[in-house]
């Protein structure tokens, strides 16, 4: 699915991979089917810098927490934990920090990962449009 609207929101099918497993796959030391992954319907949030995943998905993928930082979020200033993941939408992938959110929250794809993969949101249709990755 290239993206679709649900009550004014844009969702995509996204695959989040453990970055260490994925690196071993790229190096030919692991089969793709052996890479820890989570296939999720994620909300495309162009107001969010980074993707965000619920804590239970972070744990399932075995993503280590890299740091905890003070950040400006949709709910105000708060401390957030950051992990690292590989994200795939369609045939494109990106490595990105991922914000750890409480269990049960909606997975998000933020603007940095979208730009790394060359996607933009068509506001008229609510669908993702493929273009060139932004490497500015």
Predicted regions and their residues:
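Pepsin/retropepsin-fold aspartyl endopeptidases
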Residues: 1-136
């Amino acid at each position: 699915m290239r993206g679709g609207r649900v009550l004014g929101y844009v969702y995509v099918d996204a695959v989040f991979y453990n970055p260490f497993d994925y690196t071993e796959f790229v190096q030919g030391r692991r089969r793709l089917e052996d890479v820890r992954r989570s296939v999720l319907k994620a909300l495309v949030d162009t107001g969010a810098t980074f993707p965000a995943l619920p804590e239970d998905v972070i744990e399932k993928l075995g993503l280590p927490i890299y740091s905890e930082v003070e950040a400006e979020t949709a709910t105000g200033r708060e401390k957030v934990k950051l992990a690292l993941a590989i994200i795939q939408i369609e045939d494109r992938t990106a490595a990105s920090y991922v914000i750890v959110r409480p269990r049960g929250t909606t997975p998000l794809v933020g603007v940095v990962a979208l730009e790394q993969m060359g996607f933009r949101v068509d506001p008229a249709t609510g669908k993702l449009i493929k273009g060139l990755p932004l490497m500015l």
